[in-house]
Amino acid sequence: MISPSDLGPGSPVQSCFVEDVEPWLVERISEDPTILGRGDLVLKRASWRSRRVSLLLENPAEMALYVLELQLGPTDDRHIIRLVERWDATRKRHWRKRCFAVLVAEQIAPRYLNILQLISRAVPVALREIRVSEAAGTVTLAAVRVGSLLR
């Protein structure tokens, strides 16, 4: 479990802190996967630890899989590498389905956009920044499109 101080100053999740943030994020996405902007998806697998959440989502109608890596706080190079590695392993394991990578963080630094654009020549990537807000005692989650590098 992380504490608000682990998230860094100014973190949206810190200001609307929920106990056990990672399971809460998985539950919100599972309840309403459309917040990711990829349509109505089914959660196939989830794991989390240390401010990171890994999800595998499926769109059965389109025979498509979405490998999602979510990181609390700003994205970093390890986040990007982990996403590409998981996407590649999933693509090889489920070779009959289309496979997409989705990078989600509280903040995607502009310095990574050029790298992600280069990666997108081989890997279909979607980028989302999560926004957490609180109104009338209810904490909500939204994923804002930063850019889509999907072909």
Language model regions located:
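Charged, terminal alpha-helix-loop-beta segments
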Residues: M1-R151
